[in-house]
Amino acid sequence: MAAPAQPKKIVAPTVSQINAEFVTQLACKYWAPHIKKKSPFDIKVIEEIYEKEIVKSRFAIRKIMLLEFSQYLENYLWMNYSPEVSSKAYLMSICCMVNEKFRENVPAWETFKKKPDHFPFFFKCILKAALAETDGEFSLHEQTLLLLFLDHCFNSLEVDLIRSQVQQLISLPMWMGLQPARLELELKKTPKLRKFWNLIKKNDEKMDPEAREQAYQERRFLSRLIQKFISVLKSIPLSEPVTMDKVHYCERFIELMIDLEALLPTRRWFNTILDDSHLLVHCYLSSLVHREEDGHLFSQLLDMLKFYTGFEINDQTGNALTENEMTTIHYDRITSLQRAAFAHFPELYDFALSNVAEVDARDSLVKFFGPLSSNTLHQVASYLCLLPTLPKNEDTTFDKEFLLELLVSRHERRISQIQQLNQMPLYPTEKIIWDENIVPTEYYSGEGCLALPKLNLQFLTLHDYLLRNFNLFRLESTYEIRQDIEDSVSRMKPWQSEYGGVVFGGWARMAQPIVAFTVVEVAKPNIGENWPTRVRADVTINLNVRDHIKDEWEGLRKHDVCFLITVRPTKPYGTKFDRRRPFIEQVGLVYVRGCEIQGMLDDKGRVIEDGPEPRPNLRGESRTFRVFLDPNQYQQDMTNTIQNGAEDVYDTFNVIMRRKPKENNFKAVLETIRNLMNTDCVVPDWLHDIILGYGDPSSAHYSKMPNQIATLDFNDTFLSIEHLKASFPGHNVKVTVSDPALQIPPFRITFPVRSGKGKKRKDADGEEDDTEEAKTLIVEPHVIPNRGPYPYNQPKRNTIQFTHTQIEAIRAGMQPGLTMVVGPPGTGKTDVAVQIISNIYHNFPEQRTLIVTHSNQALNQLFEKIMALDIDERHLLRLGHGEEELETEKDFSRYGRVNYVLARRIELLEEVKRLQKSLGVPGDASYTCETAGYFFLYQVMSRWEEYMSRVKNSGTACPDAAPDAAQVATFFPFHEYFANAPQPIFKGRSYEEDMEIAEGCFRHIKKIFTQLEEFRASELLRSGLDRSKYLLVKEAKIIAMTCTHAALKRHDLVKLGFKYDNILMEEAAQILEIETFIPLLLQNPQDGFSRLKRWIMIGDHHQLPPVIKNMAFQKYSNMEQSLFTRFVRVGVPTVDLDAQGRARASLCNLYNWRYKNLGNLPHVQLLPEFSTANAGLLYDFQLINVEDFQGVGESEPNPYFYQNLGEAEYVVALFMYMCLLGYPADKISILTTYNGQKHLIRDIINRRCGNNPLIGRPNKVTTVDRFQGQQNDYILLSLVRTRAVGHLRDVRRLVVAMSRARLGLYIFARVSLFQNCFELTPAFSQLTARPLHLHIIPTEPFPTSRKNGERPPHEVQVIKNMPQMANFVYNMYMHLIQTTHHYHQTFLQLPPAMVEEGEEGQSQETEMEAEEETVSAQGNLTPSPADASLSQETPAAQPDCSSQTEDTSAPCDIATAAEPVSAAAEAATPQDAESVPTETE
């Protein structure tokens, strides 16, 4: 197998390069935003830039990046565009800038939307240029860029401006391009289209000739473009050299065709045009397909196009076609061919009279039609309306090969899509893993196209939706598997021994050489399948390794996935491995196959089952694992061996590799998706079209739902009637009781709901439009029935005063339908979620709610808040791992709940025993739940009924007299039982009050027996597993899990009969599209319908998306787009929370520009912590400029493992300064945008202050991506980069970075780089308005009483650079130590001898510690050149380090830092460093 060439990484230009560039000088003169006096617009500038900078450099990305970064498009090109100045250079410049924006994944159409007037003219010019001759004004390379621009347009149909232009190209009138017979056939198939067609013809007749000609040009554009492509394709020879421009043009063209076919609005009309052009036949017969090197990607793209042209969908209705319907279409085609043959071609009588199954295979068709002449074939095709009729006495102009392929490919039997999927192996093999076209390297730049599906706004059918996600999920995991294989195998250092075998010169923790491999079982296939049902093998390895690694291998559990690898190295013993060179040829990797562990074998060869019993101790170091192989892959390999004489792969394996369990769940998720595609997945009708991206996006909003609920009990949502009135501005609130004393929560609210034609319209936010009718809400206060006399009987209540927007979100969540809540940072997303859950629980006690989150941390936060509300904990259940992190003493996992039920049962039976005793009833009523039930029925209930009868009858003697309150207490039968409740139970003030108390007491008793009846199942079910299943299926009302757990366990949950009515998703914008979809289908449909009633998604699409490690999948396939984000883009109504209560108002301003209307809650202005300044620091937020330290800015020891020593030291110095002032270390977190910097900062903290009790460690040192969803009072942020902005250019990452701090944010960065970035301007314009040097007030200790923004009474010191700060902190620390020492001597008055003795002991101890620490940290720590630089900059602050023995954890020379590559970084491999462009962990 040929090793793929290593792609080159695109290096972004540095600041100095940017400044030196000719383009930058022009930008500063004509369009740079920071320049006040700009030169007037000059068209020659555009011509010059295009010719000299873009064309001359062969459209080099570096040049185009520079132009786009300088805001060339926004500030010069489009701002000055008009038909008068339009030219080739102008058009191409705009196209290049738009394409670059899409490559960088930044919004591209905003500029055009602001000034849309000339866009139609510009678009027409693009169309004209795309059809120009390739050897004319526009080169093929330029036309390829135009195709890419058109592709972006077709994929941006959600933008009104673009859609209005594209619709002129693709609509019913484009069928003008069909041959007349084919047009007639299509109109006959769909009769309603004929009416529209006649209307179009009429309208065309009314148009003036010029407009008609223009319309015809647009309608025939794609037909003409296809013809142009075919001519380019035919110009490529079979073996002679070919320019890559032609190949790239063809690849981009097929990509455009795929995208047009994969979108229903474009496919509806275009698929017929494409079919009529026979493009696929031309492509499959072309020379390019047969050119191995150049045509590989083209062939893969062509297969994708073939798949989509024959997709199982009705183009006109958009309905998915069933297997039977597809078979009927196939039979109709064959029979129409047979009819034509029978009527007109006597030589085809045998074919015409055969049954379909005999003649629809490719071989049969070739046998029948191959002998026919070209003219005859043409006539057959013309009878089927595939080609125009052949005139009499004329020969066909088509090749016989083309005509034969046209008929055969159209009529051959097809394998159904689901069959293909079921035959596909789930594990990747070496052919896929190292195929750069489908699994690109981390260096993917976004330039070329790839044979990958794209996730855009719309999908053809649910099958298409699942299939695209299936393929992308599979390939994304393949990319991670490739990284693991390359890391493990290269660590093992496979070399060729002198006898030609393999010798391993190294070792790897995650891989072991295989001693023996045997296939032990190949089970028979199921009926109708040709692959075995099961294939099992035994793998033996020798675990001569450290104990903890041995434990890891022996700890492999059932269903863990491993990989079997064959290496045949050709390099001799001792050859060094070079990571920069292709991996495969260095290690000689030949095969990779996946397997799934069944278990380890014991001494007798039996599988050791997973379970609570301890594992047997096995002797020796040899271990054998029984594994399941992929039956589909095994079948393919065996077929290849038998038919083609290939080597038996299963005799060759010599390495087994395991993976981290956390990253190794891909097979289970793929199986889940495949199972979904094999079942009739029933999505609720009200969601189906929205998920596919069609129809009215607001159709699932509660205001449009037919089953909208008029009256809702808001329970404890409102704190008072005033709160309720404030929550519904613009509504008339009518309370059913007039007494203010009775207008107390809880409230039931009746909303005006009308259906049919008079239904109220809602705007995009779900707010009702003003109508003539008054918006009247009828509010009914109601009293929660008394639950008993004990304090714990009182319900827990909500204490949060929700804003009116939060109330709208809660109201929407309680109603049936789809609710989308956009929650900016600090706006109370979790509180809203918990209140919705509580309200659904109380309003619909029979319904079950599923909670799904992205992370265990979010699930824990939800659970901690749910427990604070009035929800019975026996109805809560948590599935999956992570519950151990819950900060509560209660265990909500399955077995935790089982234990709770068993313990609670015993408690309740004790209560029954006490009740029995108090009533003087003999026997053992509390023996079981069953006996307790009989006791309640015969002893308790009878007494209660008798009591009620006596109390009522006591008032009948004198009908006019009011019932006597005293008799309520007198006749009460349970006085003795309630003797331990707060006394007196009955107040004696009124009959009604006492009667309510008596009923409350009975409710308390009744609840005991109700719970025991529920717990009765735990007496009947004996095993913990059965009990936990019962809890899941019957008992729990609120079930929580992560999206990953849902994807892994869907099969088990469905099998158990799991049911739910509502789904609430937190962190919805961070969940992968497919992982959001799977939880909708964790239950079987009832009578063919889904029972799902509500889907509430809460998230923030302006923060970071799901983590996708491979850049190609992230950008090219848009795999990072969550379902939540897609719904927002499609236009589904959202409730946008608009008041934050986390951060100071000034900090909120750094990111609130990204949201519609984000304000602050009142307490942000009022509470002292927000109004007080940050002690010792002049500003509450500041951007601090960091220049090169020792001539170095950013460094990159491994790919994408960026570090910046100067910033790292500066950040740690500020942290130490704050701690020395008295700030609690746990209130400070250090964030950075790259993993490399994170490791460097951690190293420096370990060296500087980690073990120092005066300073300590910050709360967290981590990346911005990992810190999403968390917060702290003070954030120190390092942006690392000095050459290019990098991935902070993604505004979502900027929003996360700016919104983590509550009280103080201090950012360390190269200001000259970041301030010029267009996307970051709103935040950086505020940051750069303040001084760019750190301003500190060293004499102001923490906490301070100074108000934020006040000028301090103390002197402000300006820190110019990192070395100055480092020395300042060192001196401050020494001063503090001396002051403390002086205090000890003066005030504690210790005897001098003790002081000296103590100092001496401490000195010796700390010296020894310092020595150990120094050796462990660096081996041999010598002063670095930083000493010299420090002494030059700050001569006064150069202490004598040698005398420092009082506390060596202080920085000896604080600038003598770790080297740019930290200790951790040096050892880091690409796997450890996670060399990921997105730099997420």
From Swiss-Prot:
Protein's UniProt name: RNA helicase aquarius
Which UniProt keywords are present, listed alphabetically? Acetylation, ATP-binding, Helicase, Hydrolase, mRNA processing, mRNA splicing, Nucleotide-binding, Nucleus, RNA-binding, Spliceosome
User: GO:BP terms for this protein?
Assistant: mRNA splicing, via spliceosome
CDD domains attached here? EEXXQc_AQR (cd17935), SF1_C_Upf1 (cd18808)
What task does this protein carry out?
Answer: Involved in pre-mRNA splicing as component of the spliceosome. Intron-binding spliceosomal protein required to link pre-mRNA splicing and snoRNP (small nucleolar ribonucleoprotein) biogenesis. Plays a key role in position-dependent assembly of intron-encoded box C/D small snoRNP, splicing being required for snoRNP assembly. May act by helping the folding of the snoRNA sequence. Binds to intron of pre-mRNAs in a sequence-independent manner, contacting the region between snoRNA and the branchpoint of introns (40 nucleotides upstream of the branchpoint) during the late stages of splicing.
Which residues does this entry mark as bearing N6-acetyllysine? Answer: K1055
Q: Where is the composition biased (Polar residues)?
A: 1418-1448
Here the segments flagged for biased composition (Low complexity) are 1455-1468
Task: Tell me the gene name.
Answer: Aqr
